[in-house]
């Protein structure tokens, strides 16, 4: 029997101009799906792009390509939730978690000093904990974790097991975190959304799993953050290739 072909479907939306020409980022998303699910996937991404609280886009690109390499299976991370009622408390929790993950305190502070600058980056930044410098060399583009998905039936079972809401934001965030933490040279990830209505963020690490923090910024704030803390011995190009190009499914057990 011929093996089914999977497709990577990716969407990005901006306002006033495409991203490369300085347009304001509105939304992005992606799926790994077979032909039978393409229409549903495209419709879902179209809806996501036009229903974002950052505004209505006037530029949208939906790109499709077939997957011509094996899809790697990655297990979901262990999960914990930290209830915080102020952004300051949430950020304090994040700092403590990063330290537990193995990031030296002075390097955590160094990264935080650059967060305003990193907020202008469309993707993630790679931060070297040995030098305290950004090493991805991608300027405002950053690194976009791509070509991953979490099959709906498996995600639903996971939410029931962990008493988590069946929320597409959680699905997307956890899928990204799981792929990021699967790379041997990445120690931890610090993230919160640029969505002004979404104040939750997380720290993810091999040692800690996915640590969700309920309030990391104030409502109405359009600045976001995504920092990958690396161990200093990383092959930068190989790491970026894995994050952007290696197709991955998040799966609780077995193979897809």
Swiss-Prot record:
The keyword Nucleotide-binding applies. GO terms for molecular function: 6-carboxyhexanoate-CoA ligase activity; ATP binding; magnesium ion binding. One of its GO terms (biological process) is biotin biosynthetic process. It catalyses: heptanedioate + ATP + CoA = 6-carboxyhexanoyl-CoA + AMP + diphosphate. Its cofactor is Mg(2+). Keywords: ATP-binding, Biotin biosynthesis, Ligase, Magnesium, Nucleotide-binding. Its EC number is 6.2.1.14. Pfam families: BioW. NCBIfam families: bioW, PRK01322.1. Homodimer. Catalyzes the transformation of pimelate into pimeloyl-CoA with concomitant hydrolysis of ATP to AMP. This is 6-carboxyhexanoate--CoA ligase. It comes from Bacillus amyloliquefaciens (strain ATCC 23350 / DSM 7 / BCRC 11601 / CCUG 28519 / NBRC 15535 / NRRL B-14393 / F). The lineage of its organism: Bacteria, Bacillati, Bacillota, Bacilli, Bacillales.
